[in-house]
């Protein structure tokens, strides 16, 4: 039997092991847990939140302020004629007045400012959750391309070893030059695929770094796409709709608009101004007390338009809550069905397709040793295995994307970050 085909067979069989031994330990490793921590600490959008909180807190302090009293001085009957010559007949009035707010205006301002702070807090939580989900999505994209590059590197080494063996056999006249050309073309295709994957890997890595203020360069991204936790039942996911981030924000906005309606109604009520002071008559050398009372005549509600607008805003939010509940239920059902479809594909690839591809390689190796098939047919069998592994990586990546979308919608943790 020819020893050269046996050498090629041995190389094809031993290559994955040699590949694993050749890998060096990465020096700069990034984990998903660290990536999420980087987002919490360095994301510019999250860093702006404390300033928004300080602004709203200051506005609440402003809302709690009551009107200041007003001091007035009045002089009359001076620099006139006859008895009002010069200041001989002048009258002086020193008075103090105070605006008294009616309709609980001050308390309604405080309630509205408090509702704004709570809405801002919920909005921050939703923004934080969305950014963490985006971080995880981009991290798993990096993991996917990292795994595909490793798989393609394994494939390239296999093709190179086969090319070397075929070139030696071609020199001996055992195979045609067309077989050598075809193998070189296959190697070029692998190189092209590697370049494309490297470009996508770099793009996904830079997209992950966009979330952080400081650039974090890593040699290796830790994680195993095949480790996917069991998803909760569809009923359990539907039960948490009322606590979903978007729904919680709408509920707080409803409370916010309710407080605004109360404020607009109280603003439509007239306020009372009371005043009192002392009056001195220069001509008679007499002093007396004065008292004043004033209130606008409420012929019409001066704030009627704002009240009506606030009522319509409440009705709109109430309608949006109902629509959002229906929309979330539909999205969760769709994603849940899609997840199970992809899970079935992953199981088929793991339990049937890949094992059958491995069996095909063993049978092809045996047939090649017996001279029944060409080396190109043997490599086709090897390509089938790599295609199956690539499909499994892509399927696992899609499963993670579905889980992260469900996390974003429900606010429930579905992925264990410590696994990486």
Task: Annotate the PLM regions.
Residues 2-5, 127-243, 335-338, 342:
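Periplasmic alpha-helical coiled-coil/stalk elements that build and connect Gram-negative outer-membrane
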Residues 37-47, 54-68, 83, 94-111, ...:
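A glycine-/polar-enriched beta->alpha junction
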Residues 110-114, 177-186, 375-383:
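Short, charged, amphipathic alpha-helical segments
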Residues 48-60, 127, 131-152, 161, ...:
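Amphipathic alpha-helical coiled-coil segments
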Residues 3, 23-25, 33, 393-420:
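Acidic, low-complexity, intrinsically disordered peripheral segments
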Residues 23-28, 72-109, 221-230, 273-308, ...:
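Small/polar, glycine/serine/threonine/aspartate-rich low-complexity segments that form flexible
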Residues 1-21:
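Gram-negative bacterial Sec-dependent N-terminal signal peptides
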Residues 20-70, 75, 99-100, 108, ...:
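Bacterial Sec-pathway N-terminal export signals of envelope proteins
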């Amino acid at each position: 039997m020819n020893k050269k085909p046996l050498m090629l067979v041995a190389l094809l069989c031993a290559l994955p092991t040699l590949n694993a031994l050749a890998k060096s330990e990465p020096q700069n490793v990034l984990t998903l847990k660290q990536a999420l921590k980087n987002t919490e600490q360095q994301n510019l959008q999250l860093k702006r939140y404390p300033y928004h909180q300080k602004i709203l807190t200051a506005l609440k302090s402003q809302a709690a302020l009551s009107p200041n009293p007003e001091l007035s001085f009045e002089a009359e009957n001076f620099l006139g004629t006859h008895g009002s010559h010069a200041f001989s007949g002048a009258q002086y009035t020193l008075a103090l007045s105070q605006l008294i707010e009616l309709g609980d205006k001050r308390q309604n301002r405080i309630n509205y400012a408090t509702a704004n702070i709570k809405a801002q807090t919920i909005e921050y939580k939703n923004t934080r959750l969305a950014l963490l989900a985006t971080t995880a999505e981009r991290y798993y994209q990096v993991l996917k391309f990292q795994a595909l590059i490793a798989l393609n590197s394994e494939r390239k080494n296999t093709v190179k070893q086969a090319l070397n063996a075929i070139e030696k056999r071609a020199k001996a006249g055992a195979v045609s030059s067309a077989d050598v050309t075809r193998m070189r073309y296959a190697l070029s295709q692998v190189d092209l695929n590697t370049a494309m994957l490297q470009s996508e890997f770099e793009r996904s890595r830079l997209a992950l770094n966009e979330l952080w203020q400081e650039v974090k360069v890593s040699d290796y991204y830790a994680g195993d796409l095949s480790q996917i936790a069991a998803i909760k039942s569809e009923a359990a996911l539907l039960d948490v709709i009322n606590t979903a981030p978007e729904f919680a924000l709408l509920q707080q906005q409803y409370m916010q608009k309710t407080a605004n309606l109360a404020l607009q109604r109280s603003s439509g009520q007239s306020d009372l101004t009371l005043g009192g002071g002392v009056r001195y008559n220069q001509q008679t050398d007499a002093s007396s007390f004065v008292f004043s009372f004033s209130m606008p005549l409420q012929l019409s509600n001066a704030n009627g338009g704002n009240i009506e607008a606030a009522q319509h805003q409440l009705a709109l939010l109430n309608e949006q809550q109902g629509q959002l509940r229906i929309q979330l239920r539909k999205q969760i059902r769709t994603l849940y069905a899609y997840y199970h479809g992809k899970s079935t594909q992953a199981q088929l690839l793991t339990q049937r397709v890949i094992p059958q591809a491995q069996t095909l390689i063993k049978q092809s190796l045996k047939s090649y040793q017996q001279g029944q098939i060409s080396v190109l047919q043997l490599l086709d069998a090897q390509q089938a295995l790599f295609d199956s592994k690539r499909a499994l990586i892509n399927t696992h990546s899609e499963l993670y994307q579905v889980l992260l979308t469900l996390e974003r919608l429900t606010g429930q943790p579905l992925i264990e970050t410590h696994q990486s």
